Amino acid sequence: VGQNPPNGAIVYYWLKEPVKKVTIEFRDSTGRTVRSFSSDTAGMGAAGAAAGGRRAVAADAPPTNKIGLNTFSWNLREGDATTFPGMIMWAGVTTGPLVLPGNYSVRLYVDGQQAAEQKLLVKKDPRSDATGADLVAQYKLLMAVRDRTTDANDAVRTVRNVRGQAVGAKDKLGTDSAQYAKLVDELNQKISAQEAEIYQVKNQSGQDPLNYPIKVNNQIAALAGVVGSTEARPTKQAQAVFDMLTKELEGYLVELRKVYKDLLPSIDDLRKKHNLPPIEVKPNTVITP
């Protein structure tokens, strides 16, 4: 049985000799880099699958660097929202939105040097009645949904990174260990409470959301499947739900910033006393591009 051709923009390139690294870069008409893929990059796919949507939805495999003819397929999507290990969502979409119809370019870099550039035209689906303004409105909301999903997931990643740094030093402060442990326990209690509002921490398997209600990161991510289900202007209801969830998320983020500001200085003072570095308030290792 034959295979269907890949969706999206297909790039063919010929390598006449072995190379270490191939990079394929897509840019829009303003020169902005939309996506960049390298042969030494793993895990290009998103954790969430799109629930419908126009044009391609499959994740992109990294480009190859073999001698001879190589083929790469870009799924015509912007970068994905970040994820974290073990994240479970119910109908949540972390896949980036499809780009707008228009002029793009693709560049091929071989071992860091630009080797070729070609123009690329992304056309609107001829079956769609959506206007250009409709597609722009849809794209803007989908990008906002993706960015807020990243904000929510990065907050969880930051909580887990801060917790790991703080708890990991409990037995390294000698006579100050008891005082340090008390401060860390308070920190952990407060940031864990906010983490549990952003993400359903009880989820351990794909069916767990049936028993435990989804939280704000999943609710925001699920909007992408609704808004991107067809080529059309987003409904007023979709925008209203997004605004409501964004406000809810911001409340949790504000509280987390307050906890870090209030508790970390005392914790870091004790760490400094014992030649330990201050706790870094940032997400742990990035999982998706």
Q: How would you describe each model-predicted region?
A:
Residues 1-23, 27, 71-73, 142, ...:
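Contiguous beta-strand segments within globular domains
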Residues 11-12, 19-37, 103-108:
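Beta-strand-rich binding/interaction modules
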Residues 13, 74, 104, 270-271:
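Conserved structural-core and active-site-/substrate-pathway-adjacent residues in large, well-folded domains
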Residues 33-95:
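Glycine-centered tight-turn motifs at strand-turn-strand junctions
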Residues 69, 99-103:
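Extracellular Ig-like/FN3 beta-sandwich strand-entry sites
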Residues 80-84, 109-118:
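Short acidic/polar inter-strand loop motif in beta-rich domains
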Residues 117-151:
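Low-complexity, Pro/Ser/Thr- and charge-rich linker/hinge segments at domain boundaries
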Residues 118-120, 151-289:
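Mature extracytoplasmic or organellar-lumen-exposed domains after removal of signal/transit peptides
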